[in-house]
Amino acid sequence: MTEEEIEQAAYKDYLEIRTRVQIAFERFAQSMRISGKHKRAIHSLSESHTLCTQARNTWNVNFRYTGYTPDGKINIVCYLYIPLRRENGVDYLFMNDPKCFKVERVSSHFLQRYKERYLDPAGIDLKGVHPAIYFMQNNEDRRQAYYLPKNWTDEELAEKCFLVSGQGLSLIKLCGKTLTYITFLDQENLSRYKAQVCEEEEYLHLMGKAKDSDILGLQAISKKLCADIE
C-alpha cells in the first residue's frame, strides 16, 4: 500500500470507530472524577480495549488518567494504535485524538534507533510496554524545533522538520494528514554540533516563554552558547 492508501484506509476506520472511542473515553473520564473520599487502585488508572472494523483491522485503545490540570480539569490521554506490517519491519499507526483525524506513523527504523540510542543506553525497563507506546507516553513535551539543515532541498523543507523533547530529537515527515517518525537522535549520543542544536532549541524555547525579568539570565546563556562555537 502507498502512503496515500494507508491514510485513506485509516480515515475509513476513523470514521467508523471514532464515536465508540469517544463514548468509551467519556465513560472512563467519568469514572475518574472521584471525590476526596474515594481512592483509586493504581491498576484502575488506565483502561484498554480493542476495536475491530469492517475492514477487519483491529485497533488497540488505551486511556490513561494523569491527574488534574492547574485549573481543575481532569487530564486523560488516549492512545489509539495498530501495527502495520511491512516488508522491512513493523510500523505503528496512531490516531490519538478521537475528535480530529490525524495519523502518526512510527516507523520500524525509528523504533530501532530509539531502542539503540535511548532505551538501551538508559537501561529502561519497559515492563511489557511496547517501545512505540513508551515513546508516545514519555515524549508528550515534544515540539517543533527551530533548527533546519542548510542542505535540505525545498521539497524537504516543505515536508520535514525536527521535533525536540526531553529524550532527544525526532526527524519527522508530514504528508497530508500523516506525520511519520523517520529516525531518532538521543541527546546523550549526539555529536557536539547536534548537542548544541539541542541547547539552542531549549534557549529559543525559553526565550519565547520568558518574562522581562528573565531576559538577562537567558542572554547570559546565549553568550555561553556563542562562546562554545568553534
Residue ranges and their predicted role:
Residues M1-E230:
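Ribonuclease/tRNase effector modules and their secretory precursors
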